[in-house]
């Protein structure tokens, strides 16, 4: 099997607050896929970083009365810790506020400027005369000029997806002061996105993005691409534009370059990795971006055009997912439907949410509802009752009478062969990111394994001393089948997989599926994963609501 070299990224969390469980969907989705790729023997570098620039960060740090550099450093540490505790296997978690990103950004800007893709012109902008600052798109809200939906930001409508400028908003208001902004002129720099229309059409039609996402992008082509404003006026927290007085790069110019900067930093740590092998225009490696559907425009149009114009490679694929709702409602701090990652981790096992998201995730950009009642039922039924019960019910006898030694013979090889033959289909589902179908297939096998034990009832056979060897072979088969199931679940449940490797006294590898454990001793099974009780969920939601009230009062 040919080993592939891959670079996989997640969209960069914004460094102005804590991660919530909705944010974790993307990190979990990408991590499952990365872990599966590594099990197949592929060389994968998995990276992420905090998106650490912009007006929002500048204002938040002022509100907290600390330097923005201090604030983003603290938040990065928190984000990194949350991802680590959720088992997200990043090779590097960095920040866009870095020397590597700044140097690469300047290089890209210079290349684009030299090749004639940077234009300048005076533009009219909304200006908050109370705060003495130009208002970025995300600090203006008003009525969408197309669908007339109220409370929409100044760059695109969350309701209908229309892209527009803040000047097109109906009845705009400053998010900062609540006042109606005035219009002022300023000279800005623009990236000539329309010049890449044909290049982008070819790239998108090559299968680099999902079909439904490509259809959405085609709508933007029909409307005609517009030059992209890549500059912002002071005051601003970010990288200054070279040879430009009091002008800064717009956060969406340096944020995707943060992928490159983060990888460059990884190359400094590991001298065996070549930056150009992964980002050079003639790269033979694969580059994958996992993103949410709200940032399609930036990643599927602006970013590949910037890469093409600056003579770097374009992504192999961009995988788009939907949003997370909680009990059918949008995740919202003000409405008390926001559960921070740290709060979740104080109450529940991270593998449980990883599994639940896996049962919902597909290759499409559909929204996913985290229904907490269904969450309890699914975790208790599948992980506890089906998977862990299989290990628990079969290991006791083996230790009691045979000191943990498994039978050396497969009494019923047909069921074992059926289990390992499923690796081809389950592997294809993992590869295609159809995790929901993969979990369904794995749980079907778990049901078969438990039915096998129920059918042969080794506890009855074991009552007769002369038939204990026969009982051992049945119990041993239960352990063999548990091992196969845990190999399939290893990308999804890293914490449980680590425990299972200790219990089984062997590594869980895809390549070892065909060979059952022979002449092998297992360790005693210990209950470290327990059922979810409704009071744990109640405690988690209560803690979340209390945290939001305290945060609102203190900041």
Curated annotation (Swiss-Prot):
Zn(2+) binds at residues 144, 147, 157, 160. ATP binds at residue 333. It is an enzyme of class 6 (ligase). Keywords: Aminoacyl-tRNA synthetase, ATP-binding, Cytoplasm, Ligase, Metal-binding, Nucleotide-binding, Protein biosynthesis, Zinc. A motif ('KMSKS' region) lies at residues 330-334. A motif ('HIGH' region) lies at residues 13-23. One of its GO terms (molecular function) is methionine-tRNA ligase activity. GO terms for cellular component: cytosol. Its cofactor is Zn(2+). It comes from the Bacteria. One of its GO terms (biological process) is methionyl-tRNA aminoacylation. It is found in: Cytoplasm. InterPro entries: aa-tRNA-synth_I_CS, Anticodon_Met, Met-tRNA_ligase_1, Met-tRNA_synth, Methionyl/Leucyl_tRNA_Synth, MetRS_core, MetRS_Zn, Rossmann-like_a/b/a_fold. Its EC number is 6.1.1.10. It catalyses: tRNA(Met) + L-methionine + ATP = L-methionyl-tRNA(Met) + AMP + diphosphate. HAMAP family: Met_tRNA_synth_type1. Is required not only for elongation of protein synthesis but also for the initiation of all mRNA translation through initiator tRNA(fMet) aminoacylation. Monomer. Belongs to the class-I aminoacyl-tRNA synthetase family. MetG type 1 subfamily. This is Methionine--tRNA ligase. The gene is metG.
């Amino acid at each position: 099997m040919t080993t592939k070299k891959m670079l996989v990224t997640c969209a960069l969390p914004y460094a102005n607050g804590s991660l919530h469980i909705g944010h974790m969907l993307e990190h979990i989705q990408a991590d499952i896929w990365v872990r599966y790729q590594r099990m197949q023997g592929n060389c994968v570098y998995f990276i992420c970083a905090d998106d650490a620039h912009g007006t929002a960060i500048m204002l938040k740090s002022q509100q907290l009365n600390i330097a923005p550099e201090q604030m983003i450093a603290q938040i990065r540490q928190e984000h990194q810790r949350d991802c680590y505790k959720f088992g997200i296997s990043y090779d590097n978690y960095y920040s866009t506020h870095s020397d590597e990103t700044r140097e690469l950004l300047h290089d890209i800007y210079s290349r684009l400027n030299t090749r004639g893709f940077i234009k300048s012109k005076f533009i009219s902008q909304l200006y908050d005369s109370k705060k003495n600052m130009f208002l970025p798109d995300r600090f203006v809200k008003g009525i969408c000029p197309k669908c007339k939906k109220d409370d929409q930001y100044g760059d695109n409508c969350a309701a209908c997806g229309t892209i527009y400028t803040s000047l097109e908003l109906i009845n705009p208001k400053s998010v900062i002061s609540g006042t109606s902004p005035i219009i002022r002129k300023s000279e800005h720099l623009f990236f000539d996105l329309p010049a890449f229309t044909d290049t982008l059409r070819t790239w998108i039609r090559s299968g680099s993005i999902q079909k439904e996402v490509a259809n959405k992008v085609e709508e933007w082509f029909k409307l005609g691409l517009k030059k992209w404003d890549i500059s912002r006026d002071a005051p601003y927290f970010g990288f200054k534009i070279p040879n430009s007085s009091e002008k800064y790069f717009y956060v969406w110019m340096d944020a995707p370059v943060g992928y490159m900067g983060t990888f460059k930093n990884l190359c400094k740590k590991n001298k065996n990795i070549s930056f150009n092998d992964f980002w050079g225009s003639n790269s033979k490696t694969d580059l994958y971006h996992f993103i949410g559907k709200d940032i399609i425009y930036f990643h599927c149009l602006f970013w590949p055009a910037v890469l093409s114009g600056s003579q770097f490679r374009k992504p192999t694929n961009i995988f788009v997912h939907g949003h997370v709702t909680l009990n059918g409602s949008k995740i919202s701090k003000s409405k008390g439907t926001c559960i921070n990652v740290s709060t979740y981790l104080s109450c529940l096992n991270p593998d449980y949410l990883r599994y639940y998201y896996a049962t919902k995730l597909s290759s499409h950009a559909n929204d996913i509802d985290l229904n907490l009642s269904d969450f309890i039922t699914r975790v208790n039924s599948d992980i506890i009752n089906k998977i862990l019960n299989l290990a628990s019910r079969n290991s006791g006898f083996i230790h009691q009478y045979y000191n943990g030694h498994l039978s050396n013979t497969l009494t019923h090889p047909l069921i074992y062969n059926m289990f390992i033959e499923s690796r081809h289909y389950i592997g294809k589902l993992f590869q295609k990111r159809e995790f929901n179908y993969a979990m369904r297939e794995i749980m079907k096998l778990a049901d078969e394994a438990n039915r096998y034990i129920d059918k042969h009832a080794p506890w009855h056979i074991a009552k007769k001393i002369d038939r204990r060897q026969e009982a051992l072979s049945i119990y041993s088969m239960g352990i063999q089948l548990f091992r196969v199931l845990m190999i399939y679940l290893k990308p999804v449940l890293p914490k449980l997989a680590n425990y299972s490797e200790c219990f089984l006294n062997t590594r869980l590898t895809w390549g070892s599926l065909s060979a059952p454990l022979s002449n092998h001793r297992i360790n005693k099974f210990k209950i470290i994963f327990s059922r979810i009780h409704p009071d744990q969920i109640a405690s988690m939601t209560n803690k979340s609501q209390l945290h939001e009230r305290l945060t609102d009062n203190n900041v």
